[in-house]
């Protein structure tokens, strides 16, 4: 069983987040009561990971945990085997006492594209929607954020996050909750909200943008990253079935169309700050994620297209302000 008591105590002391306590404990109790086939196995492995008190933690330039006195080889091998129990590792990379967790995604590259364009995170409270295993939350703390709350319904992502947090010494500035955005009340409590890699999974993208706006304080900043296509403000791709072998994908606007959508739901100061074609060096199969990845999803004869014939993945970052 997971104990979220620390988070409840934290938000009880925050006047903006206190109202969340009206619904959150029951939601997390319901989540605990739902069965997941592998969760018990993962939890046993998590409980075997040692409580960390590392001598060095670098979350400014990477996510790296190390000690002045290295682990014995046997201890390292045991730790690596425990961490490999949580395969596949999709978001990272992490370096833990010399163990390099080479994840499917180079999430640090995305962070390097996003960071120059956002308001400084120092002393801000942050919500990361669809946070994966929390890699970017650690980087947000590295930029001085006061509190990072991530939401993602994946059981495995929660386990991976808690494993890294345990090895870090139990840092209570970051918390991952196994929820979807639709389960959050209108909190209007966060200074910055991130939604990266989520919008194309939503059947109603405008509703998603409104849900994000509902979590921001007045004057707060949205950082939105999603798959886009090239084109003018009227260009939108709606795949008929899969896109790059992904199910449950719906709307791929152009960056210009997405800017219009953000303005339509009431955001101001909307800027397209980055567009980038995803490379096979940024998303690929690794020793820590052995399933198919981007190289398998592109047309082998024309890598500018997916295997379904759509334009290859292109991602845009937009920033916007809530009035």
UniProtKB/Swiss-Prot annotation:
Signal peptide boundaries: none
Gene3D superfamilies associated with the record: Vaccinia Virus protein VP39 (3.40.50.150)
Binding site for carboxy-S-adenosyl-L-methionine: 91, 105, 110, 130, 152-154, 181-182, 196, 200, 315
Key words, A-Z: Transferase, tRNA processing
One GO process term, biological-process aspect: tRNA wobble uridine modification
InterPro entries: CmoB, Mo5U34_MeTrfas-like, SAM-dependent_MTases_sf
HAMAP family (alphabetical): tRNA_carboxymethyltr_CmoB
Subunit text: Homotetramer.
UniProt function note: Catalyzes carboxymethyl transfer from carboxy-S-adenosyl-L-methionine (Cx-SAM) to 5-hydroxyuridine (ho5U) to form 5-carboxymethoxyuridine (cmo5U) at position 34 in tRNAs.
Stated name of the protein: tRNA U34 carboxymethyltransferase
Organism placement in taxonomy: Bacteria, Pseudomonadati, Pseudomonadota, Gammaproteobacteria, Vibrionales
